[in-house]
Amino acid sequence: MKKKIGLLVMAYGTPYKEEDIERYYTHIRRGRKPSPEMLEDLTERYRAIGGISPLATITLEQAKKLEKRLNEVQDEVEYHMYLGLKHIEPFIEDAVKDMHNDGIQDAIALVLAPHYSTFSVKSYVGRAQEEAEKLGNLTIHGIDSWYKEPKFIQYWVDAVKGIYNGMSDAEREKAVLIVSAHSLPEKIIAMGDPYPEQLHETADYIARGAEVANYAVGWQSAGNTPDPWIGPDVQDLTRELNEKHGYTSFVYAPVGFVAEHLEVLYDNDFECKVVTDEIGAKYYRPEMPNASDAFIDCLTDVVLKKKESVL
């Protein structure tokens, strides 16, 4: 009989319906309810992208496809997928409890975020390992980052090339690629967090592969807190690049995210487009990885490499 291995797929989570927004936001704010104004602002953003984010559906599809693919490409072990979310059910701890109840003794933990940071990957894996230790007889093997995975870089190289190939030579000369990820509080830099450096590396790999000379790194979707967040913000960066270099076509690659959701559909497709419209420039944003075969193949390689190194 094949050994069963847990596949713990972790992600941020998103409201399933409008009524979930308040409790979801309260969880993000560590139990503090948002003010009516804050709640209204977030609700309006969801309404602007069609009422609710497609993230929940995409995340589940990514996880199910990954489990299926892992069991197709090898027959040494049997992977059982468990979904654990940071801010809404099924919570990370619930997924770990389910694994334990199913008799799983080893699990590979994959966060659907390519770059490592103490705020994201470390906290997700930490929560899972803490719960596993409480329950006993279950070891969680966490994957720190996978932004260097060749198939991840290739996904974005192909996506960016697809946009540039549709441009005339004249437009290409005046085009710039903005590679971005979710901003985090600036204090992580002083803590030696590798997150900003990893995004810069990712941008270099993609630009080199797609043969794009003009590119910059930006940050987006910063939280509304008194602490300073890492910049430049993508909107400010767009204006600056237009003023300083005269770029008139902007290609946004939000590579820190793996699916279409609020941060991409609103913060990029709406807010960044407002800026490009304002300055008379063209807006482009390649398709996100979502549950595409190319992306699932990438994640399959990531999990298999981790499994080989620990089990």
From Swiss-Prot:
Annotated GO biological process: heme biosynthetic process
Compartments, as annotated in UniProt: Cytoplasm
Gene Ontology CC: cytoplasm
PROSITE patterns in the record: FERROCHELATASE (PS00534)
Residues bound to Fe(2+): H182, E263
CDD domains, per database record: Ferrochelatase_C, Ferrochelatase_N
Binding site for Fe-coproporphyrin III: Y12, R29, R45, Y46, S53, Y124
Positions in coiled-coil regions: none
Pathway(s) the chain acts in: Porphyrin-containing compound metabolism; protoheme biosynthesis
Enzyme Commission (EC) number: 4.99.1.9
Family from the record: Belongs to the ferrochelatase family.
HAMAP family, alphabetized: Ferrochelatase (MF_00323)
Protein name, UniProt field: Coproporphyrin III ferrochelatase 1
Lineage: Bacteria, Bacillati, Bacillota, Bacilli, Bacillales
Gene for this chain: cpfC1
